[in-house]
From Swiss-Prot:
Zn(2+) 2 binds at C104, C107, C110, C118. Zn(2+) 1 binds at C51, D54, E74. This is 1,2-Dihydrovomilenine reductase. It catalyses: 17-O-acetylnorajmaline + NADP(+) = (2R)-1,2-dihydrovomilenine + NADPH + 2 H(+); (20S)-19,20-dihydrovomilenine + NADP(+) = vomilenine + NADPH + H(+). Belongs to the zinc-containing alcohol dehydrogenase family. Class-P subfamily. It is an enzyme of class 1 (oxidoreductase). NADP(+) binds at S53, L193, G195, L196, S215, T216, S217, K220, K221, V278, A280, T302, R349. Binds 2 Zn(2+) ions per subunit. Pathway: Alkaloid biosynthesis; ajmaline biosynthesis. Homodimer. GO terms for molecular function: oxidoreductase activity, acting on the CH-OH group of donors, NAD or NADP as acceptor. SMART domains: PKS_ER (SM00829). It comes from Rauvolfia tetraphylla (Be still tree).
Length: 363
């Protein structure tokens, strides 16, 4: 690519919605995608999930992004072109792109199928790709990525309700598998019942795990038990309920994306077990050491999942009919959707109908 102009490197005209500054407000945006390389898959985007991370990123709350920024970590569509050396898929296949579009391929994490922990991981938006240009996410008409980071989307899964699996799904599936919280008969606590939390309940039940949902309010009790199949519900602000649940859980998956007290949660764990934080937040938690030490309990965290885990998760979801509960929205509703996400006013995930509602900018 050396010596080539940006237009030569990225000859394919594309469009989407982008944030231009830390207000996070999105508006129509024209840009370009690279030509399809030998190992690339070009994707016509039909649906894109919207997550709390998109809101944080659009506002650059993590302090690591540049503008303009096209969000979208949960992308589903149709393969429209494949490179000459692509072996996993063909034109016309249903495919998906998740959190990553690249990594170094050489570090310990990459060679051991843990690309999401590569120090040079390239996320689907807001990062610099191997050719030195910015990556743009799924709030757009099309994308192109190396086949390693493009997944076969099972025919059995509905595309709209399946889109959130690409981030929210793998973000709960991966820690359950890695930390052994997927064993039938185990008792798992799920903190928070949002985009990640409701999928955590669904995956856990499919694994044969007993699930207790933990929330700050009783409002979601009916949804948790009657709609999602949870076995029990605890209100974390109710001291009597928390005391009754003391020492009953084999593990906790905490999906809340903001800072909150974790000491009360540690009391729910059996000795020698884990609290796993998966809610993306830039804040710092107060970690009480004594409650950990006396029960040899531990606190861990994960981010996303590997490419192998993502494909495995999609196939498992198809086998067990696991999809997200979604509200499908048009592209021009995205700023209202972001406001509602901030207010926790969604059950449980917004998905943009990109294929039918995204139109090219007028100028």
């Amino acid at each position: 690519m050396a010596g080539k102009s940006p237009e030569e490197q990225h000859p394919v005209k594309a469009y989407g919605w982008a944030a231009r500054d830390s207000s996070g407000i999105l508006s129509p945006f024209k840009f370009s995608r690279r030509a399809t390389g030998d190992h690339d898959v070009r994707v016509k985007i039909l649906y894109a999930g919207v997550c709390h991370s998109d809101l944080q990123s659009a506002r650059n709350e993590m302090g690591c992004f540049t503008y303009p920024l096209v969000p979208g970590f949960e992308t589903v569509g149709i393969a429209t072109e494949v490179g000459s050396k692509v072996t996993k898929m063909k034109v016309g296949d249903k495919v998906a792109v998740g959190i990553m579009v690249g990594s170094c391929g050489k570090c310990d994490d990459c060679v051991n199928d843990r690309e999401c922990y590569c120090p040079e991981v390239i996320t689907s938006y807001g990062r610099i790709d191997h050719d030195g240009t910015p990556t743009y996410g799924g709030f757009s008409n099309e994308t192109v990525a190396n086949e390693k980071f493009v997944f076969r989307f099972p025919e059995k899964l509905p595309m709209a309700a399946g889109a959130p699996l690409l981030n929210a799904g793998v973000s709960v599936y991966s820690p359950m598998r890695f930390y052994g919280l997927d064993k039938p008969g185990m008792h798992l606590g799920v903190v928070g019942l949002g985009g990640l939390g409701h999928l955590a309940v669904k995956f856990a039940k499919a694994f044969g795990v007993k699930v207790t949902v933990i929330s700050t309010s009783s409002i979601k009790k009916g949804e948790a038990i009657n709609d999602l199949g949870a076995d029990a519900f605890l209100v974390s602000t109710d001291a009597k309920q928390m005391q009754a649940g003391s020492g009953t859980l084999d593990g906790i998956l905490d999906t809340v994306p903001v800072v909150h007290p974790i000491e009360p949660l540690l009391g729910l764990l059996k000795n020698h077990t884990k609290l796993v934080l998966v809610g993306a937040t830039m804040g710092s938690f107060e970690l009480p050491i004594l409650p950990l030490g006396v029960g040899r309990k531990s606190v861990a965290s994960t981010v996303g999942g590997s490419t192998t885990e993502a494909q495995e998760m999609l196939d498992f979801a198809a086998e067990h009919n696991i999809t997200a509960n979604v509200e499908i929205i048009p592209m021009d509703y995205i700023n209202t959707a972001m406001e509602r996400i901030e207010k926790n006013d969604v059950r449980y995930r917004f998905v943009i109908d990109v294929g039918n509602t995204l139109t090219p900018p007028e100028s």
